[in-house]
From Swiss-Prot:
It comes from the Bacteria. It comes from Buchnera aphidicola subsp. Schizaphis graminum (strain Sg). This is 2-oxoglutarate dehydrogenase E1 component. Belongs to the alpha-ketoglutarate dehydrogenase family. It catalyses: N(6)-[(R)-lipoyl]-L-lysyl-[protein] + 2-oxoglutarate + H(+) = N(6)-[(R)-S(8)-succinyldihydrolipoyl]-L-lysyl-[protein] + CO2. Homodimer. Part of the 2-oxoglutarate dehydrogenase (OGDH) complex composed of E1 (2-oxoglutarate dehydrogenase), E2 (dihydrolipoamide succinyltransferase) and E3 (dihydrolipoamide dehydrogenase); the complex contains multiple copies of the three enzymatic components (E1, E2 and E3).
Length: 923
C-alpha cells in the first residue's frame, strides 16, 4: 500500500459506520459550541465543513454501504438542542454555581457551561420566544433570555440542588418538577414570614442570653446556624398536616440546648439550674446538659404527636443508628405506616464525612432488616471541624455530603442566611421522603460564631474566617431587614418580639405559647418504660408439643440433607430419645416466649443459620429458594418473630438494636456477633450506651448480646470476646454478664431476660464447640422444672475428702472435668460460676458452707493472666473464702494477643493449663 494512500485511509477510518452514532453526538456538541469538544475533533469538523463533501468517497477504501452520510445543518433544530442542553446542564451542574456560602469564604468560580456565551446565542436568539418542556408542563412559552435567568435563579441561587446522579428517572423528574414549579420568589405569605422571623429571633436571643448569664461556660452555641430552629418547627408543622404520630431527633451537642428550649419547650429555669448545679439528681450519676434528651407531646386536634430527642454521648454520629432502631421499633410495635414516623438525624459537616458509622448506617437504610421509610438528614455545615477549616484537611471529596451518593439520596445545599430557601429545602425533603421512602440530605451551610465551645478562641487558628464572621450580620438581622424592606414588620415590632421572649427567659417560663399545646416531660423519668409480664408456668406436655411443632417442616419444602438430619434429631429430642442440644434449647426458648404474645428480634452476621451451623431458624427450599421459618408458624396470636442476617457491620448494627430495645414494650432483642472477638468493632456502643445509659440518663434497655467465646486453637481473632472488658464496665447493677455451659441454661436465661423484673442489658458469652457436644446437653424435664442457675455446684457426688476447689466459667469446665475423670481424681471440686455479674455472692456462700475446712482454692481460666475474669473476680472470691485459705489463679501467661496463632501451641498451652489446675503447689 502506498504511503500517501495509507495515511489518507488512516485519517478517514474514524468515519466508519460503526462510529456513526458516537460521531453524531460529538458533532452536535460541536455545532452548539465548537470549544466544547476536543481540539482534534474541532480540526476534523472544521475541515469537514470546508470540504462540504464526504471524504470517504475520495478513496477506493470507502465502505460500500455508505454508512456515514453528510449532516445537514438545521438551525431551528440546533437552537432546540442548545436550549435542551442548557436546561439539562443547569439541572445537572447548577448547584456548583449556587450561592450557598453565607461568608463567601472562597471566590465564586465561573462555570462556562452555565453562561449564555458558552452556547453562542445571538442577540436575536436571546429575544426569541420558544416552546419548551420546562417546569415539567406540556409546553411552556418563554424567551430564551428569560429562560436562562429562571434557570440561573432556580438552580444557582441560595439552594444547590444536587440530585441528577440518581439512577431512578422517576425520582429525578419528580424533584425537577418541584424545583421548577414551586421554587420561586414570594413563596410565603406575611403570616408565615413573621413566624419564621420569630423562630430565628428566639434562637438568637436565647444564645445571647445564655452567653451573658453564664459567660465563659460551655454551651455549644447554635449562633450562625439558628435557621435550624425554624427548620425543625417546619417539620412539626408538616407533621400536623400529614398525620405524623412520632418524630425522633438525633443530634450532637452543637445547638442542642437551643433545640431543647425552643423546640421541645424545656423550661428555661430547669436548664439554668443545670448550669448552676441546682437540683442535681441523686438517683443516677447524670450527664452534661448538652447530652440530655427528652420527649414532648404536641397536641394536634384530638391526636398527639410525640417529639423525642434521643440522648447521646459526645461520640459524634453514633446516635444515628440508635435513632433508626428507635424508629423501627415504633413502626413494628405500634404497627404504623412508615409515613407516620419521622426520623431526623442532625449532623456536623466534619463528622458526617469523617465518621465511619455514617457509611454503615446509610448502607442499612434500604435493607429489609433496618429500613424505616427514609430519614431526613440535616447537616449543620459551619465549615469547620474544631480547629480545622481547610476542606483539603477535612475530606477527600468536594462536599461533606458526598457520602449520600452511595445510597442515591438527593442533597439540597442551602445558604442558612436565606431562611425562606431553607424552609423550601426542608419542605421538598419531607415530600421526597414521603413519596419515595428514601433518605434525603439538607446541607445547611452556615458558620460558627464562636469557637468549638465558648471557652475557645477561634482567632488563634482561623483569623481570616473569624474576621469575616465578626463583621457578618446575624441571621436575625438579615431577615429582619428583609421583612422591614418588604414593609411586613417594623423595627419596633421586632424589639417587642425580642423583649417579650427575653422576659420569659428572665422569669424562667416556657417560651412556647400554651395554645401550641406543647409541654416538656422529664425524659429521665418517662422516656422509656418497661411493662413487665408475669412469668408463666411451664407444662411438660405443652413444651413437648411445642418442640414438635417448631421442628415439623411441611412436606412441600425440599430441605437440604444436612438440615433435614438436624431437624430429625430435634424430633427425636421431643420424643425423649435424645437430650436437647444448644440450638434446640435456644429455639424452644423463643417459641415459649412467642406463645405468650411477646415478640423476638434477632440480628447478626449469619445468625439465621448460625456461624457454627447450629441454629437453622430458616429452612431454605432447595428447589425454589423460598424460606420457611418454623418460629413464625406456631399459632395465630403468637408474638412476631424476626431474625435478620445483618449487613457486615458491628457498630451501626449493634447501635440500631440498642435503639430498638428501648421501645417500651415486651420485646426480646438480640444481637449476635459472628465471633465474640468482633464485638470490639462496636466498642463505643458498649461503652457509651449499653453499660452506662441507665446511670447517665436513666434510660433502660434489655438488649441481649451473644458473643461466641472459647479457646479452641482458632487464633487471636477467633477465641476471645474480651470478657475482661465487659467485667471492667460492671458497676451499679448496670448489666448482666453470663457464661452458660449447658443447653438448659440458655433456655432459662432467655426466659429470665423477658419475664423477670430485672430490665438490664445481658451479655452472654456463648460456646462454640459445646453447641453439639453431648456433655452440654439437657433433658426436656430440666428445661421444664428448673430455672437458670447463677452457680452450678459439683455434679459428681463421689468427690470426697475435698482438698481443693476449682472455680471456673465457660468451656474450660469440661476440659477440667475430662482431666479429672481421666486421672481418677476424687478430691477436687469443680464449681461453675455461670453469672459473673451481678456476682452471685449468696449462692457461692451457700455452697462453701459445706466446705469450710478447705484451704486450697483455684480460679482457673483459659484466657491469659492479664485478660479474662481473674482481676475482676479475685477480690470478690477472696472475701467469701474460709479464714486462712489461699486463692490462686491458673491461666495462660500474660500476653498482648488474646491467643496463640498456631494450633500446636494452643494445645500445649491448654494441656499445661489443665495440668496446673490440679497440680498447682501452694508456696
Amino acid at each position: 500500500m502506498k504511503k500517501n494512500t495509507l495515511e489518507k485511509w488512516f485519517n478517514s477510518s474514524w468515519l466508519s459506520g460503526n462510529n456513526q452514532n458516537y460521531i453524531e453526538k460529538i458533532y452536535e456538541s460541536y455545532l452548539i459550541n465548537p470549544k466544547s469538544v476536543d481540539i482534534t475533533w474541532q480540526d476534523k469538523f472544521s475541515d469537514l465543513s470546508k470540504k462540504r463533501k464526504n471524504i470517504l468517497k475520495e478513496e477506493k477504501f470507502v465502505y460500500k454501504n455508505n454508512s456515514f452520510k453528510e449532516i445537514k445543518i438545521d438551525k431551528q433544530e440546533i437552537l432546540e438542542k442548545k436550549i435542551n442542553y442548557i436546561i439539562n446542564t443547569f439541572r445537572k451542574k447548577g448547584y456548583k454555581k449556587s450561592l450557598i456560602d453565607p461568608l463567601k469564604l472562597n471566590e465564586q468560580k465561573k462555570y462556562k457551561y452555565l453562561e449564555p456565551t458558552f452556547y453562542h446565542f445571538s442577540e436575536d436568539e436571546l429575544k426569541k420566544t420558544v416552546k419548551i418542556d420546562f417546569k415539567n408542563s406540556s409546553q411552556y412559552e418563554i424567551k430564551i433570555r428569560d429562560l436562562y435567568e429562571q434557570l440561573n435563579n432556580k438552580y444557582c441561587g441560595s439552594i444547590g440542588f444536587e440530585y441528577m446522579y440518581i439512577e431512578n428517572s422517576f425520582e429525578k423528574k419528580w424533584i425537577t418538577k418541584h424545583i421548577e414549579l414551586f421554587f420561586k420568589e414570594n413563596l410565603f405569605i406575611k403570616k408565615e414570614k413573621i413566624r419564621f422571623l420569630k423562630e430565628i429571633l428566639y434562637g438568637e436571643t436565647f444564645e445571647k442570653y445564655l452567653g451573658k448569664k453564664f459567660s465563659g461556660t460551655k454551651r455549644f452555641s447554635l449562633e450562625g446556624g439558628e435557621t435550624l430552629i425554624s427548620i425543625l418547627h417546619e417539620i412539626i408543622r408538616y407533621s400536623k398536616k400529614n398525620d405524623v404520630s412520632e418524630i425522633i431527633l438525633g443530634m450532637a451537642h452543637r445547638g442542642r440546648l437551643n433545640v431543647l428550649v425552643n423546640v421541645l419547650n424545656k423550661n428555661p429555669q430547669v436548664l439554668f439550674n443545670e448550669f448552676s448545679g441546682i437540683n442535681i439528681p441523686k438517683e443516677y450519676s447524670g450527664d452534661v446538659k448538652y447530652h440530655m434528651g427528652g420527649i414532648t407531646k404536641i397536641k394536634n386536634d384530638k391526636k398527639k404527636i410525640y417529639l423525642k430527642l434521643a440522648y447521646n454521648p459526645s461520640h459524634l454520629e453514633i446516635v444515628n443508628p440508635v435513632v433508626l432502631g428507635i424508629a423501627r421499633a415504633s413502626i413494628n410495635q405500634l404497627k404504623i405506616s412508615e409515613n407516620k414516623f419521622l426520623s431526623i438525624n442532625i449532623h456536623g459537616d466534619a463528622s458526617i464525612i469523617g465518621q465511619g458509622v455514617i457509611q454503615e448506617t446509610l448502607n442499612m437504610s434500604q435493607t429489609e432488616a433496618y429500613k424505616i421509610g427514609g430519614t431526613i438528614h440535616i447537616v449543620i455545615n459551619n465549615q469547620i471541624g474544631f480547629t480545622t477549616s481547610n476542606p483539603k484537611n477535612l475530606r477527600s471529596s468536594k462536599y461533606c455530603t458526598d457520602v449520600a451518593k452511595m445510597i442515591q439520596a438527593p442533597v439540597f445545599h442551602v445558604n442558612a442566611d436565606d431562611i425562606e430557601a431553607s424552609i423550601f429545602a426542608i419542605q421538598l425533603a419531607l415530600k421526597f421522603k414521603k413519596k419515595f421512602k428514601k433518605d434525603v440530605f439538607i446541607d445547611l451551610v452556615c458558620y460558627r460564631r464562636h469557637g468549638h465551645n465558648e471557652v475557645d478562641d477561634p482567632f488563634v487558628t482561623q483569623p481570616i474566617m473569624y474576621k469575616k464572621i465578626h463583621n457578618h450580620p446575624t441571621i436575625g438581622q438579615i431577615y429582619s431587614n428583609l421583612l422591614i424592606s418588604e414593609k411586613l414588620i417594623t423595627s419596633n415590632d421586632i424589639e417587642k418580639i425580642i423583649e417579650k421572649y427575653t422576659t420569659k427567659l428572665v422569669q424562667g417560663k416556657n417560651v412556647l405559647s400554651q395554645e401550641r399545646n406543647i409541654t416538656f416531660q422529664n425524659g429521665n423519668k418517662n422516656f422509656f418504660i418497661k411493662k413487665q409480664k408475669e412469668n408463666t408456668q411451664l407444662n411438660f406436655l405443652n413444651i413437648k408439643d411445642l418442640l414438635y411443632s417448631i421442628n415439623t417442616i411441611p412436606n412441600s419444602i425440599e430441605v437440604h440433607n444436612r438440615v433435614k438430619k438436624i431437624y430429625q434429631e430435634r424430633i427425636g429430642m421431643a420424643d425423649g430419645q435424645i437430650l436437647l442440644d444448644w440450638g434446640t434449647a435456644e429455639l424452644l426458648a423463643y417459641a415459649t416466649i412467642l406463645k405468650e404474645g411477646i415478640s423476638c428480634r434477632l440480628s447478626g452476621e449469619d445468625i439465621s443459620r448460625g456461624t457454627f451451623f447450629h441454629r437453622h431458624a430458616f429452612i431454605h427450599d432447595q428447589n425454589n429458594g423460598s424460606i420457611y421459618v418454623p418460629l413464625q408458624n406456631i399459632e395465630k396470636n403468637q408474638g412476631k418473630f424476626e431474625i435478620w442476617d445483618s449487613v457486615l457491620s458491628e457498630e451501626a448494627v449493634l447501635a440500631f438494636e440498642y435503639g430498638y430495645s428501648l421501645f417500651p414494650s415486651n420485646n426480646l432483642t438480640i444481637w449476635e456477633a459472628q465471633f465474640g472477638d468482633f464485638a470490639n468493632g462496636a466498642q463505643v456502643v458498649i461503652d457509651q450506651f449499653i453499660s452506662s445509659s441507665e446511670q447517665k440518663w436513666n434510660q433502660k434497655s434489655n438488649l441481649v448480646l451473644f458473643l461466641p467465646h472459647g479457646y479452641e486453637g482458632q487464633g487471636p481473632e477467633h477465641s476471645s470476646a474480651r470478657l475482661e472488658r465487659f467485667l471492667q464496665l460492671c458497676a451499679e447493677n448496670n448489666i448482666q454478664v453470663c457464661i452458660p455451659t449447658v443447653s438448659s441454661q440458655i433456655f432459662h436465661l432467655l426466659r429470665r431476660q423477658i419475664f423477670s423484673n430485672v430490665y438490664k442489658p445481658l451479655i452472654v458469652l456463648t460456646p462454640k464447640s459445646l453447641l453439639r457436644n453431648n456433655v452440654a446437653r439437657s433433658s426436656l424435664e430440666v428445661l421444664v422444672n428448673e430455672n437458670f442457675k447463677n452457680v452450678i455446684n459439683e455434679i459428681d457426688k463421689n468427690q470426697k475428702e475435698v482438698k481443693r476447689i476449682i472455680f471456673c466459667s465457660g468451656k474450660i469446665y469440661y476440659d477440667l472435668l475430662e482431666y479429672r475423670n481421666k486421672c481418677d481424681i476424687n478430691n477436687v471440686l469443680l464449681i461453675r460460676i455461670e453469672q459473673l455479674y451481678p456476682f452471685p455472692k449468696d449462692e457461692i456462700l451457700t455452697i462453701l458452707k459445706s466446705y469450710s475446712y478447705v484451704q486450697d482454692f483455684i480460679w482457673c481460666q483459659e484466657e491469659p493472666h492479664n485478660q479474662g475474669a481473674w482481676f475482676y473476680i479475685k477480690d470478690l472470691l477472696s472475701t467469701l473464702l474460709p479464714l486462712n485459705s489461699h486463692l490462686n489463679y491458673v491461666s495462660r501467661p500474660s500476653a498482648a494477643s488474646p491467643a496463640a496463632g498456631h494450633i500446636l501451641i494452643h494445645r500445649k498451652e491448654q494441656e499445661k493449663l489443665i495440668n496446673n489446675a490440679f497440680n498447682f503447689k501452694i508456696a
